[in-house]
Amino acid sequence: MISVVSGACATITEEDIARLEPLIEQSSYLLMQLEVNLEANWRVLALAKQHGVTTILNTAPAQSLPDEILSQIDIVTPNEVEAEMLTGIPVENVENAYKAAQVFFEKGVKAVVITLGSRGVYVATPEKQQLLPVPKVDVLDTTGAGDAFNGGFVTALSEGKDLWEAARFANALASLSVQRMGTTASMPTRAEIDQFLAEHPEM
């Protein structure tokens, strides 16, 4: 079980956000998650859209979101539990992942990346859908796997990789992280990620 004690994360102010606007303006991507006060998230989202920044929402922890917010998200990265909460479709197989993605598209999201644990990651745009497999690994601790995936995903996008290659890179990062205990301490080096990808061309 993962518990959230928001603390300072629930107290982000308009002044805090205003100080960040120059950084947002210079950015290519904005990655958000739901462990901060939501009004702060939506203010940052508005700034990102104002400056033409690609917006990515990691929908953790799972909760319902208004359609007017989802319509401003370029890429959404839920796990299967979060995808079901936001679409009403249990993501138990690829067919249902496809259906869930269609619901997100109807809400205005441009790309959907659903992490499916040991089943891999389902990546979809209105034009292309694909399940990317994940190699079997010895799982020790899944805490932080979603953070590992999302961090790797945005890193790869910022390096110019397309949606599918970015998801593949993120899959590798998360696969390595779950083989170690902890969160920050479990994150692999870039060399380890590149080696893992080279050893698993089937990903």
Predicted regions and their residues:
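Conserved phosphate-binding/catalytic region of the ribokinase-like
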Residues: 63-69, 94-203
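Conserved N-terminal subdomain of the carbohydrate kinase-like
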Residues: 1-31, 46, 193-203
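Conserved beta-alpha-beta core of the PfkB/ribokinase-like small-molecule kinase fold
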Residues: 6, 16-17, 29-99, 119-121
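A short alpha-helix capping/helix-coil boundary motif
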Residues: 1, 21-25, 78-81, 131, ...
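Structured loop/turn residues at beta-strand edges in well-structured enzyme cores
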Residues: 22-25, 71, 107
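Short aromatic/basic micro-patch
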Residues: 11, 77, 187
